[in-house]
C-alpha cells in the first residue's frame, strides 16, 4: 500500500445524482478523464458514431435506464464559468460543444482538480477546451443497455452521453444503474420474486434459479480486504495543507480524493468535487485556502472487513461516492469510490473462475445486468427517470422530451452578411443564448432576437421564460432546430423620448422663452430712457 502525506476532506453534500455527460469518448480516453490519468488534448480526430446494433423487441435499451439531464456548454467557456454552472446544477461533469455545435469533449470534477488546480492554471483565464477529454464515446437511446453498461465498467468511467441526431439529449450515470440493479436483485432474493424465476427460466433454463443468489454471493459478499492490497494508493494530507497541495496529491497518485489524517487516523476527506464546488466555483484561491476550510470532517468510513455489498449500501444511503477504509488498528488504508468497488467486484468473479467455469465468468457481467434489469424494481423505485419517461411514450415509441429536461437545443439564424449560423445552446438561459448570438454576429448591442409562431407573427425573446416557450413551441411541431430572426436596429428609445417631450411640451417651452426675451427687451428700453433723461 502506498501512502503519501496530503490533506483532504469529504463533502457532506455529495450526492449520487452526478450527471455524467460526454459523448463520443474513446474508451481509453474516457477512463483517463474519469481517473485523471489522461494527457490533455490527446485525441483530436472526430470519432465515428456508435455501431448500430439490431435490437429485438425483448432487449432492454438505454432509454429504459435511469437517464440524467446533461449540462452542455461551449468549449470556449472558461473553467471558472464552467465550474459555476456545474455548481449551480450540482453536477460533476459537463459536455462541451465546438463552434459547429458538435459534441467535442467532456470535463469532470477530477479534470478540474488534476488538470487545472494541480497544474497551477488560473480557472478564470483557462478555457475548458484546454483541459477537456476530447471526443468521448457516446451511445444512442436505442443502444443496448447491457452493452452501454459493460462499456462503462470495462472502460472505468461513470459518465456516458446519450446522443440523438447529433444532439446530446441525456447522460447515463452507471452508479444509478448499479444501485438499481442491486436493489432489484436483493428484492428478488429476499422475496423469491416470481418474475425473477421467469426471467431465469427464459434466459438460462429452469435449473438455474439459484443464479441470482450465487451471483450476489460471488460479487458482493467478499470483504473490502479482497480489494485493498499492498499496492492500493491512498493520498494523505494534513488539515493545514493548502488545497493546491491536495490537488497535486490527487494528480500524482491518479486518485480523486485525499484523506485528512492525524497520525494516519481519519479526520476528514476532500474530493475533486469538493474542490470544484467549494473552491473553484466560489472563486477561492487554492494556494491560500486550507484543506480544513473545505473538507468534510469525520466522514463515514468502513473497516477492511466490511463486505462489498455493505460498502455500497453505506455509500448509497449516505449519498456520497467515496468511502475511506481503515484497518483493524484504525489506520487509513484506502479511499474507494463506487466505480472502483464495482469493477473490483466483477474482477473478483472472473479471477475466481478457471477452466470451463471461466466461460461463465466471461458472461457473468452480462448476466448480472440482464437479470437485474429484467427483475421487478423495488417499491420506492421510479420505473424510469424523468428523462427516460420522456423518451418513451405509452406505446413504447420514442418521443421528444418535454421542456426543461433537455439541456440544449439547436438554433440557427442568418447574420448581417447573409451567412446561416447553426449552434446548440441551452433552452433555458436567454443570457447564454444572447451571448452566443452576439459573439457569432460580432455585435455589441442593439440586437433583438425573435422567432416566428404558428400565426406567422415574430415573437420577441427577451427573458428565460420566452426562450423556454419558444423551444417548447418548436418541439411541439417536431422541429429539431428553431430558426431565430434577428433585428440589428440600434435602440431609438432615447430619441423617441426626446421627440415626445418636444411634441407634448413644446408650446410651453417656446412661450416661456418668449416671455423671457420680452422682459429683457423692456428692461433694456427702460434703462436707455433713464440714462437719456439723466443726461438732460
UniProtKB/Swiss-Prot annotation:
PROSITE patterns the record matches: CBS (PS51371), PB1 (PS51745)
Gene label: CBSCBSPB2
Keyword Transmembrane set for record: yes
Membrane-protein topology: Single-pass membrane protein
Source organism of the structure: Arabidopsis thaliana (Mouse-ear cress)
Gene Ontology cellular component annotations, sorted alphabetically: membrane
Major localization class: membrane
Record protein name field: CBS domain-containing protein CBSCBSPB2
Location of the region described as Disordered in the Swiss-Prot/TrEMBL record: 1-60
Signal sequence segment: none
Residue ranges constituting the PB1 domain according to the UniProt record: 406-489
Amino acid at each position: 500500500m502506498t501512502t503519501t502525506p496530503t490533506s483532504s476532506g469529504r463533502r457532506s453534500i455529495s450526492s449520487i445524482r452526478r450527471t455524467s455527460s460526454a459523448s463520443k469518448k474513446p474508451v481509453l480516453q474516457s477512463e483517463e478523464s474519469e481517473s485523471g490519468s489522461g494527457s490533455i488534448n490527446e485525441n483530436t480526430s472526430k470519432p465515428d458514431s456508435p455501431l448500430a446494433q439490431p435490437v429485438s423487441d425483448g432487449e432492454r435499451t438505454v432509454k429504459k435506464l435511469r437517464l440524467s439531464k446533461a449540462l452542455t456548454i461551449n468549449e470556449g467557456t472558461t473553467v471558472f464559468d464552467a465550474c459555476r454552472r456545474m455548481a449551480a446544477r450540482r453536477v460533476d461533469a459537463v459536455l462541451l460543444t465546438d463552434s459547429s455545435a458538435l459534441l467535442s469533449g467532456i470535463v469532470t470534477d477530477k479534470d478540474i482538480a488534476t488538470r487545472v488546480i494541480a497544474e497551477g492554471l488560473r480557472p478564470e483565464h483557462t478555457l475548458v477546451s484546454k483541459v477537456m477529454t476530447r471526443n468521448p464515446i457516446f451511445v444512442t437511446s436505442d443502444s443496448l443497455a447491457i452493452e452501454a453498461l459493460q462499456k462503462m465498467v470495462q472502460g472505468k468511467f461513470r459518465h456516458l452521453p446519450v446522443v440523438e441526431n447529433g444532439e446530446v439529449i441525456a447522460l447515463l450515470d452507471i452508479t444509478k444503474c448499479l444501485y438499481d440493479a442491486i436493489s432489484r436483485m436483493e428484492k428478488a432474493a429476499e422475496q423469491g420474486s416470481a418474475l425473477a424465476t421467469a426471467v431465469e427460466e427464459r434466459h438460462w433454463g429452469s435449473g438455474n434459479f439459484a443464479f441470482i443468489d450465487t451471483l450476489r454471493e460471488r460479487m458482493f459478499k467478499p470483504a473490502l480486504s479482497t480489494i485493498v492490497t499492498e499496492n492500493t494508493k491512498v493520498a494523505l494530507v494534513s488539515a493545514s495543507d493548502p488545497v493546491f497541495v491536495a490537488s497535486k496529491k490527487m494528480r500524482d497518485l491518479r486518485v480523486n480524493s485525499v484523506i485528512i489524517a492525524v497520525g494516519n487516523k481519519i479526520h476528514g476527506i476532500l474530493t475533486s468535487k469538493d474542490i470544484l464546488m467549494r473552491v473553484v466555483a466560489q472563486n477561492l484561491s487554492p494556494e491560500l485556502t486550507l484543506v480544513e476550510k473545505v473538507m468534510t470532517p469525520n466522514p463515514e468510513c468502513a473497516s477492511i472487513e466490511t463486505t462489498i455489498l455493505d460498502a455500497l449500501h453505506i455509500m448509497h444511503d449516505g449519498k456520497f461516492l467515496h468511502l475511506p477504509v481503515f484497518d483493524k488498528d484504525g489506520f487509513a488504508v484506502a479511499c474507494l469510490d463506487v466505480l472502483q468497488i464495482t469493477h473490483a467486484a466483477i474482477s473478483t468473479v472472473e479471477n475466481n473462475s478457471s477452466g470451463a467455469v471461466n466461460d461463465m465468468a466471461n458472461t457473468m457481467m452480462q448476466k448480472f445486468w440482464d437479470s437485474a434489469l429484467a427483475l421487478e424494481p423495488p417499491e420506492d423505485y421510479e420505473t424510469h427517470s424523468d428523462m427516460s419517461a420522456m423518451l418513451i411514450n405509452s406505446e413504447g415509441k420514442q418521443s421528444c422530451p418535454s421542456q426543461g429536461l433537455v439541456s440544449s437545443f439547436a438554433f440557427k439564424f442568418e447574420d448581417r452578411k447573409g451567412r446561416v449560423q447553426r449552434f446548440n445552446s441551452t433552452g433555458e438561459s436567454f443570457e447564454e443564448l444572447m451571448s452566443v448570438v452576439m459573439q457569432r454576429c460580432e455585435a455589441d448591442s442593439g440586437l433583438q432576437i425573435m422567432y416566428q409562431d404558428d400565426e406567422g407573427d415574430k415573437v420577441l425573446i427577451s427573458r428565460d421564460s420566452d426562450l423556454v416557450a419558444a423551444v417548447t413551441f418548436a418541439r411541439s411541431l417536431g422541429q429539431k432546430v428553431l430558426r431565430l430572426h434577428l433585428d440589428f436596429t440600434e435602440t431609438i428609445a432615447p430619441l423617441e423620448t426626446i421627440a415626445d417631450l418636444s411634441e407634448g411640451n413644446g408650446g410651453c417651452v417656446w412661450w416661456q422663452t418668449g416671455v423671457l426675451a420680452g422682459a429683457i427687451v423692456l428692461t433694456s428700453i427702460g434703462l436707455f430712457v433713464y440714462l437719456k433723461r439723466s443726461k438732460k
